[in-house]
Amino acid sequence: MLSVKVFFQKEPVFCISLLLALASCLLVHPDWDYLAYPDYRTLALLFCLMIVVAGFQSLGVFALLGRTLLRMARSVRRLSLMMVALCFFCSMVITNDVTLITFVPFTMLVFRMIDRPERLVRLVVLETVAANLGSMATPIGNPQNLYLCTSSGISMGQFARAVLPYAGIALVLLLTVVWIQRDELIPDVTLYGGDEDKKRKLLPAVLPFVALLALCLLVVFRVLPYLPVLLCVAAVVVALDRSLFRSVDYFLLLTFLCFFLFLGNIKRIPEISNVLTQLVSGRELWAGILASQVISNVPAAILLAEFAQDLPTLITAVNLGGLGTLIASLASLISFQLFARDYPEKKGVFLKAFTGWNLVFLLVLSAAAVVLTGL
């Protein structure tokens, strides 16, 4: 019983999605139509992107980038600006959760080395906000964007109009908040040596993963079919580093699969489907933001997409909905867990700062959404 409780605490969204899927199977008995429920293209892309990013991470690409930028910093303010900007822009390509897994521990290490740990709470919170909001700017920045873009056939122009204005506002807000903090010089710190030699050795090793990332992007833009790219990625990883298969978040894939099963069954129950359509249609902005606060933005995107008429507004909503509560974005939970592991005595301080700053950004960006969408 204890192991079940521990597993639920570790994978709450998967457990909830599994229970919903199983419950829906009691209402719609399993048949061959179940095979048509999943969006196999989205699942294949998620798998490919996770394994490609794991390849970059295993080669130390992101840590090397962080150290390179660190050497350019001369003050706490400048260092903080660089780290927040790094999280914002990296999340567009390597996703928000991988960005935080990579750079939050690096940030904590650096601020301990310069003897400024008291600055960490606000900076890690702002890095989390930056990763969540930066990831909204591209179709591959987070799972909800990937799903909504691949399953709906929305054009890149529509997608850009749905996210780029808010990403721009968010970047200005983030940099302003960091800039107004008290500044001070930081001492010279030697983090690691031999980076120039590492860069020379890194290039040939990283090229195959760059090529695989390019293939994934061509699938996102519907230039290539997903199945040949999936097989190509799997073959290259088998040849280069089979251990990367262990880096894939299979519970995220299973969570998507469970939600596809749940939603496929719900659509076959006219009474429930009609009610959800009436609740969501025309209210995509608030439905997406509010649902994200309770079930997090990835499940909210999968659930609401089936009943929404205005998909661009829903894309805006579930991305802004990643702000707010700690569970609104699963990437935020990653930051909290990483911080709490090193500073367990400051968990309450972190949660207070996290909630405060997230509400500020959510209110400002929601107001911008009301103005820009004319709601």
Region spans (language model):
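Cytoplasmic-side transmembrane-helix entry/capping segments in multi-pass membrane proteins
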Residues: 11-15, 40-41, 67-81, 120-129, ...
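C-terminal transmembrane helix pair
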Residues: 160-171, 286-375
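Long, contiguous bundles of hydrophobic transmembrane helices that form the permeation core
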Residues: 2, 172-233
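Short helix-coil transition sites and intra-membrane helix breaks within transmembrane domains
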Residues: 54-60, 90-102, 134-142, 289-305, ...
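Hydrophobic transmembrane alpha-helices that form the pore/transport pathway of multi-pass ion
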Residues: 83, 89-136, 147, 302-316, ...
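Interfacial loop-to-helix junctions that mark the boundaries of transmembrane helices
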Residues: 4-10, 32-42, 154-166, 197-202, ...
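Transmembrane helical segments that form the transport core of multi-pass membrane transport proteins
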Residues: 37, 59, 63-66, 211-313
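Membrane-interfacial loop-to-helix junctions in multi-pass transporters
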Residues: 40-42, 71-84, 113-123, 203-207, ...
